[in-house]
Amino acid sequence: VLATQGNYVYDTKTICFTGGGNGPFYGLEKKDDTKESLFYIQAVLNYWMIEMIVKSKASKFRGDYYSHGKQFVAQLPIYRINFDDSNEVKIHDEIVDTVKNLMKLKNKRDEQQTKPQKETYERLIQIEDNKLDGLISKLYGAENCRREDLDEE
């Protein structure tokens, strides 16, 4: 899977796809003993710092594309929620709610007919994206890390 950024999505329509070791797409199936929501996993996979890890290890291609092959994604440090810790459960649930809200906002944006209406939704989406980054940063202890301060090369 070649991309210029992370693009992990939740499939609401159970679309069937194929994929081998390097794409074109992957699917995640939640194991029975996994308590984390797939929306939570989606959020963490899309988190900018996790994507920097993928990019730092991946094969690079023309046009700033890089591989999201299984070998670069399978061992990512997905933060496991301690479901005995009420603070972590609260953050998990906020992340899930924020992802669901983002999905709704993006659908509403796509339904809009005028540029000003679309721009309004873009601003709302940006607010929710920032909130999501903050929540995930808190879990990883990275509240003081900023994307622009880290060298992506």
What does each of the following model-derived ranges do?
Residues 1-91:
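Polybasic, glycine- and aromatic-enriched phosphate-binding surface used to engage nucleic acids
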Residues 78-153:
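Non-catalytic DNA-recognition/assembly elements of restriction-modification systems
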